[in-house]
Structures are given as structure tokens and as C-alpha cells.
Amino acid sequence: MASDPTSSPFQPSSSLYQGATLLYPFAPGIFLPYEYDGLRVEAAAARTTAWIGTQLMISPIYDVKGPDAVEFLNSICTNDFSKLGPKGLRHAILCNEKGQIMTDGVVIKLGENHFRTYWLNPPIDFLLKNSNLRVEGTDQSLTEYFIQIAGEKSLEILENACEGDLHDLKFATHRTVSIDGKQMRVIRLGMTGNLAYEVHGPIQEFEDIYQRICSVGERFGARKLGMNAYSGPNHTPGGYPNIHIHYPLPWFESETGRYKGLSAYLAQNPQLGWFNLNRQLTGSVGNELEERFVTPYDVGWGNLVKLEKSGDFLGKTALTELAASNRRTVVSLEWNADDVASVYATQLRGRDTQPCEPIDMQLDMYYQANAVSLNKGDGVIYRADRVLAGDKPIGISTGRVIDYHYNRMISLGFIDKTNATIGSELSVIWGTPGTPQKKVRVKVAKLPYHDSVRNEERDVSDVPRWAPQSRLT
């Protein structure tokens, strides 16, 4: 990891904090901007102009290199890396022997037998250190900056910032460009569901690149994005289930096969395992941890499970069986406004009535509470509520948010396929066991919930193309 503190973008003088009104203590010495203009304004920018975010600067980054790099990745991931080209990437998934997701993230190819992974650590480091293959792993966390530009104006902003044409960059590909002679990697990828890009480069060059992008972005009406507006308000309406947001990971519940010893490894490296260490479980699912773990099929990623690839890989036997049953899928759930109001009204019925848990929060990501609980040695809070068809449990609801662009309360549901038809009337049980519980009617809605053209389907030929005569002054 980066050892030079002067190269950190988290220094008090960093332009990262310019305009921030609240900060979030993510880790010792690392404060993330929590809000700039507020969640309503920041999240909505992706649907009209764009937002510029830096939340993923804290990403676990891990390089895999060596003659057997492809074989190693194929043995631990559901994906097939044997034909990955020099400009390509994979949305990689690691599973345990039950077929449950252990982590997922992006893998890009940097060179022959050299791959960079995002969010696959710590499982990937544990597996590599216990592998007999000719590979080596290097933790690259905090050595590169990670800037996201998401929204309808994102391509125009990026082209004007680097003064070059990026219209040829296809979805899920990357290439190198420069700003004022500084090399950076641009990836066409994002979490809002619509047109979006990522920019990566040496951490020492963050200030110059970030200031340039923000300066150009301001002219296009872009907004800086804080942590509060990042997770739920983008991933849930964008139709992207996300680790550590919509579901926990079974890092301490997978002591079989190649994962035997992982719990001890994480106990020795608690800073790597804190997302799933001493979890606090809320919502009507209660302490039923197994119900919260998901498979690739539960979250709609069956296309990323390559059962036909040569060789064995972690979870293949279970995933083969799950593919045959393929019982659950992911949907958007639209919450009934009157029922939500009824739950909220319990807060106002006097001291003789025990109120339900608050439902007026903008999103079910407990940043403030997590900061306090982690300082006390407790774990991250995960909420999941039970979904019913009539009185029959059919799955869970997670990632509840108020979407201010559509003026709706929505969540993602991992539910039985037989009840996943758009328009189906279901209900969610609101309330952690031991607190008052109420049914809230929900309706299955399209996934993703938003109406934007998805990034992978977006034809950018209608986006104004940068040319030297269009240079901003």
C-alpha cells in the first residue's frame, strides 16, 4: 500500500474536500466527503448532467501476475479469463462451495499474465497464498486514484478534460489517455446504470487530474458526489446489487475446501475483514444470516457463471445444481406510499404507543451508526426485510432508498421467480424482530428502475464530439 502520506488525497488541503459540508470517518486518517450539496441534488445529477465521485478511492486493489495468472483466476472465479483481450475487463465473481458470493468486482488486464483486481481482496489474497500455481499477488490499495464520472454529460466532460475523442471506447473496455501529459486509464463502466466512466492513475497525480475534471464538469452542470448519495441512490435504482450494501458476505462461514483457514487469516488481518466482522443484522429477516447470503443467480448474474469452461472452479458443483433450479431472481420493489405513511405515523401517536422503526430515512445505509459502532468494536449494520406473497415468504428486500428523481421509495428484492412478474403485488414486513412490525405493500417494478438507456446499450454517436475548435477556455 502507499506509504508516502504526502501523496494521499486525504490530506486536509486536498481539493477533495472543497465544497464538502460533512465528512465521514472511514478509517484512521481517512475522511471521505459525506455531502456536498446534499443527497437530493447530488444523486439526481446522474439523470440530467453528471456527478463526479471519489468514493472508490478506498477500493481494495490487488494485482495478480505470473505465468499461471489466467489459470489461477479461472480456478477461483466463475468467469473465463482465457480469452480476455488487452483492453477488456471482467465483472468477476468468487463463490464458496455452496455457490454463495464471497465477493465480486472488476478485473482488468494490464499486460501479458498481469491483471489488476478491484474489490476481490481479501479472499483473493488468501487463495493466492495457499495456491501452488506460479503467481504472485501485490496489494496496490491507495496507490492509484479512482474517479467516477456518471451521467448523461459524462462523455463530454471527460473528452473536454483530456482534450481528446473517446467516442470509440466501448462498454466494459479501457484504454490510456492523458491530461496535460499525465497518463491515466479510462474505463467505460459505472454504477448508475446509464452512461458512466472511471478514471484511474497514480495517486500522486490525483490533485491535478481531479481539479481538471471538476473544473470542466462544473461548466457542464456536474455535481460532486458525497458518500451519502453514492451507495443506495445509485445502485438500487440502477439495478446493481452490491456487496456490503445489499448483502453481507460469508467470509466467516465458509470453512470448507480451499477456504479452510480463511477465518483465522481474517482474524490476523482484521482491517481486511471488518465489513463482515461482528455484523449487526437489522430488519424483519432478523438474525437469519443464511437468508442474507446470495448466489449469482439470486442477483441476476447467471450469465457470469461459465460452467462450460475447462477445469474446476470454486463453487462449480453447487452452481451447477443451482443453475438447474434457478429459483430466485432480482427485481425492483416499489413501496406503497400510504403504507409507508402508516408506518411513519406510529412515530406520532403518543407515548402510550410503541413506534415502528423509523422509515423516513433517505436510505438504509447506516454510515453514522457504522462509524460509531466500529469505534466501539462492533460491526457494519446490514438491513434485510422479509418479502411475502400473501402470507408465504418468498425472499428478501434490501437497499431501500427514497429516489428523489422519481419521488418513490424503492428497494431491490431477491425473490422467487414465480412472483417476479412486473406489476405483481407483494408485501414487505417492516420491523426487526422485537420491535412493532407492519406490512407494507410493494409492487414488482422493472429492473433497473430508472428510465435511462443502460451504459452497455448506449449509442454515443449523438453525444457532441470533442474537437480542437471546441476547446473550453
Descriptions of predicted regions:
Residues M1-C95, Q100, V330:
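Acidic, proline/glycine-enriched N-terminal capping motif
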Residues M1-Y34, R40, L110-T473:
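Conserved, structured C-terminal
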Residues S75-L133:
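Well-ordered mid-protein domain cores that form the structural environment of catalytic cofactors
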